[in-house]
UniProtKB/Swiss-Prot annotation:
This is Histidine ammonia-lyase. One of its GO terms (cellular component) is cytoplasm. There is a cross-link at residues 143-145 (5-imidazolinone (Ala-Gly)). Belongs to the PAL/histidase family. It catalyses: L-histidine = trans-urocanate + NH4(+). The lineage of its organism: Bacteria, Bacillati, Bacillota, Clostridia, Peptostreptococcales. The modification 2,3-didehydroalanine (Ser) is found at residue 144. It comes from Alkaliphilus oremlandii (strain OhILAs) (Clostridium oremlandii (strain OhILAs)). Contains an active site 4-methylidene-imidazol-5-one (MIO), which is formed autocatalytically by cyclization and dehydration of residues Ala-Ser-Gly. One of its GO terms (molecular function) is histidine ammonia-lyase activity. It is found in: Cytoplasm. Pathway: Amino-acid degradation; L-histidine degradation into L-glutamate; N-formimidoyl-L-glutamate from L-histidine: step 1/3. Its main location: cytoplasm.
Length: 507
C-alpha cells in the first residue's frame, strides 16, 4: 500500500487526491511526532497546575468563563463532542470524509493543538483502515471552525455515532471493533483540538478545485469542437492578441485552443468567410481565462490552508505559552469558495450559449436542433433546455454565502463565515457545469458530423473519437439522458482529459 508522510507542512493537492480517491495511507513523520509530544506536555502542565486557560480548564463559547476541575476533564471533552454533533442532511461523500480526516490529522501534526499522540494516531488508523464516519453535510457556520460536522467525525473516534466500514453503515463502536481499533477516551483539550478547524469546508473545496482545474481544460476542448462545428475564426487566438493583455488564464486558454485545433481544416481565418465571430466564440480565452485565474487563486489559498494550524487556543511549547486567537474562522476560505462557484458558473454560462449557437439554425447554418428530419425528430432541442435549467440554477447558487452572518453562542461568536455552505455550493455548481459541458461536447460532435471532407485538429480529433466511443451520432430521436450521463462520466472519470492530454499538453 502506498503511503504519504504528513508533517503539517508539505501536504499538496495531489496528495489529497491520492488519499481520498486512490486510498493511499498516511503516516506521521518523526518530527511531527516529537512536536505533538512536546506540545502535549504544556497542556498536562496547565491542567496539573489548575491554570485557567480557555478550552483546557474552561467551558466553551459563552461558557468560556466557567472553570472546570481536573476531575471533570474527561466528561467535559465527551460532552463537547456529543453536544456539538448536530449535523443534518445527507452524509458527505466518501472522498470528502477521507479528505476531512486527512486534513485534520495534518493540521494536528503541526504540533500546536495539544492533542496526545495516541489520539492522533487513532484518527490516522481509522483513515488507513477505511473507517469512514457518517458526517451530515449541513450544520456548520464556518466559525468556530466546522464544529458540528467534525464532531460527527470524532463521535466514531470515541466509539459513538455511525460509520461506513467495508461498504456497510453501522454504529461507530461496531465499525471500530470490526477494524480492530480501540476507541479513545478524550482528555483535556482534545475534543476542542479535534473539532475546532476549517477542514470540512477545505476538504470539499480542495476536491472541487482539483476537479475544476480539469473541467477548465475540458471546457476548452468543448469550445474547440464547437469552433470547428461553427467553422469558427481562429485568428482571434493569435498569441499577439493575448500577449498585450497578459492575464495568465487568458494566455493559457488561447494556447490550449491553438494546440487543440492545430491542423484543423474546419476552422477559418479572419475575412475568409466572415470578419469576426460572436463573443462566445471570439472571446473564449477572455471568458475561460478569467475562470482559470480564479481557480488558480483558490488553489493557492487551499495550499496555505491545508498546511495551517486552525485550532484555538494555540499552544506554543517552545515559549510555554497558550494563546487564544481566531485561526478557526473560515473567512479566507469562504470568500475563496464563493469565488470558485462564480468561476465555475461562468464556465457553464458560456457553454450553454455555445450550445444555443449549435442548435439554432439561424446562428449555426446547421440543421435545426442538429437533426436531419426536424419536426418528426426534435433532436437536441431539449438538451439545450436542460443546459439552460442547470445554468439558471447555478446563477442562484453563485450568490455568495460569505456575505451572510448570523451571531451565535449568545453573541460571543458574533461573526461567522458560512464557508462550508460556500464550499458545498461550489461543489454543486461544479456538478451542474459538468453536465452543461457534456451537452456541449455531444452537440459539437453532432454538428461536426454534418460536414464532409474536412480534418479535425490534433486534439479535437481525439476528443471527438473519445466521445463517439461512448455516444453515437444521433440519427433519429432516442432517450438522450443516457447519452448525457455517458458524456458527463467522460468528464467525471477523467477519461476524456487523459485521452486528449496524451497527444496535446493543456494548461
Amino acid at each position: 500500500m502506498k503511503k504519504i508522510m504528513i508533517d503539517g507542512e508539505q501536504l499538496t493537492l495531489q496528495d489529497i487526491i491520492h488519499v481520498t480517491r486512490n486510498f493511499y495511507e498516511i503516516e506521521l513523520s518523526e518530527d511531527a511526532k516529537n512536536r505533538v509530544r512536546n506540545n502535549r506536555k504544556v497542556v498536562d502542565r496547565y491542567v496539573e497546575e489548575e491554570k485557567v486557560v480557555y478550552g483546557i480548564t474552561t467551558g466553551f463559547g459563552k461558557f468560556s468563563d466557567v472553570v472546570i476541575s481536573k476531575s471533570e476533564t474527561e466528561a467535559l471533552q465527551r460532552n463537547l463532542i456529543i453536544s456539538h454533533a448536530c449535523g443534518v442532511g445527507n452524509p458527505l461523500e466518501e472522498d470528502v470524509v477521507r479528505g476531512i480526516m486527512l486534513l485534520r490529522a495534518n493540521a494536528l501534526s503541526k504540533g500546536y493543538s495539544g492533542i496526545r499522540l495516541e489520539t492522533l494516531s487513532t484518527l490516522i488508523e481509522m483513515l488507513n483502515k477505511g473507517v469512514h464516519p457518517v458526517i451530515p453535510e449541513k450544520g456548520s457556520l464556518g466559525a468556530s471552525g466546522d464544529l458540528a460536522p467534525l464532531s460527527h467525525m470524532v463521535l466514531v473516534l470515541i466509539g459513538e455515532g455511525e460509520a461506513i466500514y467495508q461498504g456497510k453503515r453501522m454504529s461507530g463502536r461496531e465499525a471500530m471493533e470490526a477494524a480492530g481499533i480501540r476507541p479513545v477516551v478524550l482528555t483535556s483539550k482534545e475534543g476542542l483540538a479535534l473539532i475546532n478547524g476549517t477542514q470540512v469546508m477545505t476538504a470539499i473545496g480542495a476536491l472541487t478545485v482539483y476537479d475544476a482545474i480539469n473541467l477548465s481544460k475540458i471546457s476548452d476542448i468543448a469550445a474547440a469542437l464547437t469552433i470547428e462545428a461553427q467553422r469558427g475564426i481562429v485568428t482571434a487566438f493569435d498569441k499577439r492578441v493575448h500577449e498585450v493583455r497578459p492575464h495568465a488564464g487568458q494566455i493559457s486558454c488561447a494556447e490550449n485552443l491553438n494546440r487543440l485545433l492545430e491542423g484543423s481544416t474546419y476552422t477559418t481565418k479572419q475575412g475568409e468567410i466572415k470578419v469576426q465571430d460572436a463573443y462566445t466564440l471570439r472571446c473564449i480565452p477572455q471568458i475561460h481565462g478569467a475562470s482559470k485565474d480564479a481557480i488558480q487563486y483558490v488553489e493557492n489559498k487551499i495550499n496555505i490552508e491545508i498546511n495551517s494550524a486552525t485550532d484555538n487556543p494555540l499552544i506554543f511549547s517552545e515559549d510555554n505559552d497558550v494563546i487564544s486567537g481566531g485561526n478557526f474562522h473560515g473567512q479566507p476560505m469562504a470568500l475563496s469558495f464563493d469565488f470558485l462557484g462564480i468561476a465555475l458558473a461562468e464556465i457553464a454560462n458560456v457553454s450553454e450559449r455555445r450550445i444555443e449557437r449549435l442548435v439554432n439554425p439561424q446562428l449555426s447554418g446547421l440543421p435545426a436542433f442538429l437533426t436531419e428530419k426536424g419536426g418528426l425528430n426534435s433532436g437536441f432541442m431539449i438538451t439545450q433546455y436542460s443546459a439552460a435549467a442547470l445554468v439558471s440554477e447555478n446563477k442562484v447558487l453563485a450568490h455568495p454565502a460569505s456575505v451572510d452572518s448570523i451571531p451565535s453562542s449568545a453573541n460571543q461568536e458574533d461573526h461567522v463565515s458560512m464557508g462550508t455552505i460556500a464550499a458545498r455550493k461550489a461543489r454543486e455548481i461544479y456538478k451542474n457545469a459538468v453536465n452543461v459541458v457534456a451537452i456541449e461536447l455531444m452537440a459539437a460532435a453532432q454538428g461536426i458530423d454534418f460536414y464532409e471532407g474536412y480534418t479535425l485538429g490534433e486534439g479535437t480529433q481525439i476528443a471527438y473519437d473519445t466521445i463517439r466511443n461512448k455516444v453515437s451520432k444521433l440519427q433519429e430521436d432516442r432517450v438522450m439522458y443516457f447519452d448525457i450521463n455517458q458524456c458527463a462520466n467522460l468528464i467525471f472519470s477523467g477519461e476524456l482529459i487523459e485521452a486528449v492530454e496524451k497527444a496535446v499538453e493543456l494548461q
